[in-house]
Amino acid sequence: MSRSMGLILLLAALPGAPVDIVATPSFLTALVPFASYEPPPIYLDAQQGRFYVTEPDPSLPPEAAARQRRGHCRHSIAAMVAHETYPGHHLQLVTAQELGSEVRRHLWTPVMVEGWALYCEQLMAETGYYTTPEQRLFQLVNLLWRAIRVVLDVGLHTRGMTAREAVDYMVEHLPIERRSAEAEVRRYCAWPTYQLCYAVGRRDLLSLREDYRAAAGDGFELRRFHDALLGYGGLPVSLARWGMGLEERP
């Protein structure tokens, strides 16, 4: 995590709150097979984010435990840390809590928040954060995963796809074992339309960055763009675009 913090100093202002790495609570492991993030409560003086990491289940039989451990590949850690902590969720959500606007502190949309975190996985590839071909490969696997979530989100909630079919699709197209895929699909079923927001948000943010770059010309600075974007908290990307003067008000 310290490597990503060092790089992000060149890309955005760092918030003051630290983040703890803790084991995922047992009541969440059925929905979170790998990792997740919980921001600090807004009105507490002690601002501490939590990066939850789901550990392999020690109660599984040896063969099942080995399959689960294969899903917890060390080469995926770099992109996961970038997504959940710096420059991803922790940086964005804690920065939002420090804003003066109550609306920007409290309201957020998954297209902005999850789009930002997935954008950050790619951003760290652009900065050279991934030091091995395997780390870069898993960043691209994550990108494929989010594209597959679009297919499954739409399929499960509007096309009659069953949970079993969704699990089969994941196992066929991704390096994921069945138990973890089942946990993922349970979450997809519980949160309609949320899962497609990762890919849609990343697409919208990349488009916004290019339009901002074109408007700034030779004066474009990546950190200035990120600081301006983070100043909108988790508001919709369309509102950030309008606020930056790149489009008529939605």
Task: Please tell me what each predicted stretch does.
Residues 1-250:
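Long, His/Glu/Asp-enriched segments that create or flank divalent metal/ion-associated functional microenvironments
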